[in-house]
Amino acid sequence: MENQKMPISSVSNLKDLNMISRPVANFPPSIWGDRFINYACEDENEQAQKERQVEELKEQVRRELATAIDKPLQQLNIIDATQRLGIAYHFENEIEESLKHIYLHTYVENTCFEGSDDLYSVALWFRLLRQDDYRVSCDVFKKFRDSEGNFKNSLMEDAKGLLELYEATHLSVNGEEMLDDALEFTKTHLELVVSHLNYPLAEQVRHALYQPQHKGLPRLEAVYFFRIYEAYDSHNEALLKLAKLDFNLLQSLHMKELSHMAKWWKSLDFATKFPFARDRLVEGYFWILGVYFEPQYSLARKIIIKVFTMISTIDDIYDAYGTLDELKLFTKAIQRWDIGSLDQLPEYMKPCYKSVLDVYNEIEEEMDNQGSLFRMHYAKEEMKKIVEGYMDEAKWCHEKYVPTFQEYMSVALVTAGYTFLTTISYLGMGEIASKEAFDWLFSRPPIIEASESVCRLMDDMRSHEFEQERGHVASGIECYMKQYGVTEEEAHDKFHKRLVKAWKDINEGCLRPYPMPKPLLMRILSLTRVIDVIYKNEDWYTHVKKPMKDKIASLLIDPMIV
């Protein structure tokens, strides 16, 4: 950590010091500059033509789904392709009805279907029904085990089946030891055979071993899957063309949204006013695309990205700049939630505090227009909670206090920010985000606790070395090592086991009967997926290296060639 000294004249209400020593994290600057500010709209006639093509192709796909009504395996393959290609949102009703029909006939009535003795077909059946939240039993895989309960050696020759079973295991819930065994079995053997496979199956296996589909971002996974799907002779040309056209139309919408946000962000001039903070509008928007990319959530994205940039800046004020006395003032101001508190703040904090109130006022006006003003209470309360958590961590850092792991997690799950972001993600979702939904969220059900855990544990595992070098508050890794007297490697192993359980809790929380409407549960799952992608190897939000840059470019710069 470096310490910089700042003239006291720029800070109000602190008169006893001539200079203030501040921790500076030296976060890398934004790599994007003004790239996304200007957006050239596509010719209206060309766009209209593409939209007509999309509608025609959608009708063709609907017909294909309908004609396969008595062919479950064919239906499953079409559904799988639409989901992997990122266009399932166009066919939600058709997919829902198809899977319901398959569930009733093949599971409830126990009717055999073509391929019901084939590992690939059974695993695909299981995965797609679990993805649609049906409580199908993993006992369907017993037929692939020998008399001693081990998976049969003959399966090792079926790479396609092993891959599908591997993908299915990531939808497991607590108590499904058979799927735990299946994960170990498939992972081990796929790693052994991948170098002997041909393209495109070899590429599919490599990708899945790195990024299981269930934990990936659907739109990002679609970009990868386009070329894989196209390489198979059996691919559906209508599906592929529809997916590429739709991808480009959505990309245009997202670029337009980002351009609007970039102009707003530049007008705030936070990069100049808060040079110590991470300037990550583009990365933040990428994060939000992982939460929802569909066109009907345009307003929701505009709301959450503005709040996201505010909380990211506030996080860095507490984490990498503010003194304890200054942070106490900011915490009190947030608790009061009153523009009159502005005069009590240090000069450099004022633009941030005012912008927070401005953003919330703008959202409040929108909620009022929708007759949903009650939502603002929850949004404000979550902001107050997370800022209180930042304050607790700042005190620990100032006192060089290393809490117990349990004490740490009681605060760190809040500062992970995922209940906060889930709350904000609901604001622009329309009538489905009822008062009951917000009350349910505030009760911290197991699925939200699990999501918070994934966020916090992955953040700590990937960023604790950088943070300790700069004098950050003790991370969960350090707290765990100190309390239990274990090595860093052992702490990582314990965290990994906690992550496995948390994902099982999330999977369980998504199963029918739904505690809340499915779109609300999907925001929790989607936010958790973002963490798995961005913190896969390291903190790519803070340190925007080539893998992260490439992911952003694939969604927001590079169109699909149709």
From Swiss-Prot:
An example Gene Ontology molecular-function term: magnesium ion binding
EC code: 4.2.3.-
Gene3D superfamilies: Farnesyl Diphosphate Synthase, Terpene synthase, N-terminal domain
Manganese recorded as keyword: yes
Residue positions of motif DDXXD motif: 315-319
Binding site for Mg(2+) 1: 315, 319
Record's keyword terms, sorted: Lyase, Magnesium, Manganese, Metal-binding
Cofactor: Mg(2+); Mn(2+)
Positions bound to Mg(2+) 3: 467
Alphabetical list of InterPro entries matching this protein: Isoprenoid_synthase_dom_sf (IPR008949), Terpene_cyclase-like_1_C (IPR034741), Terpene_cyclase_plant_C1 (IPR044814), Terpene_synth_N (IPR001906), Terpene_synth_N_sf (IPR036965), Terpene_synthase-like (IPR050148), Terpene_synthase_metal-bd (IPR005630), Terpenoid_cyclase/PrenylTrfase (IPR008930)
Pfam families: Terpene_synth, Terpene_synth_C
Enzyme's top EC category: lyase
Highest taxon above the source species: Eukaryota
A GO biological process held by the record: diterpenoid biosynthetic process
Keyword Magnesium: yes
Position of the signal peptide: none
Similarity remark: Belongs to the terpene synthase family. Tpsa subfamily.
Described purpose of this protein according to its UniProt entry: Sesquiterpene synthase.
Name of the protein this chain belongs to: Probable sesquiterpene synthase
Species for this entry: Santalum spicatum
Designated gene of the protein: SesquiTPS
